[in-house]
């Protein structure tokens, strides 16, 4: 962890802060990891699906030491051929990681 990045605790706290920051920057954010039933149905889908100005951002929230499950890695690999200027997939470990998407 770098000195400039504050500790936010668990994955839920990191995710909540990322959602807050992206929404403040004008993104429409759908949280897919809300409850146990939803998590089971959408097991490998990224935690956040975000839309703004024709751009779609898929975000997997992890703690600095958090590891992606194999299904999440597979989903990311399956998405790679479809990524372009209007679709991006990111793993964010700190709320500050969302800053590149503010403009």
Locate each region found by the language model.
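Catalytic phosphate/metal-binding cores of nucleic-acid and nucleotide-processing enzymes, i.e., regions
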Residues: 1-103
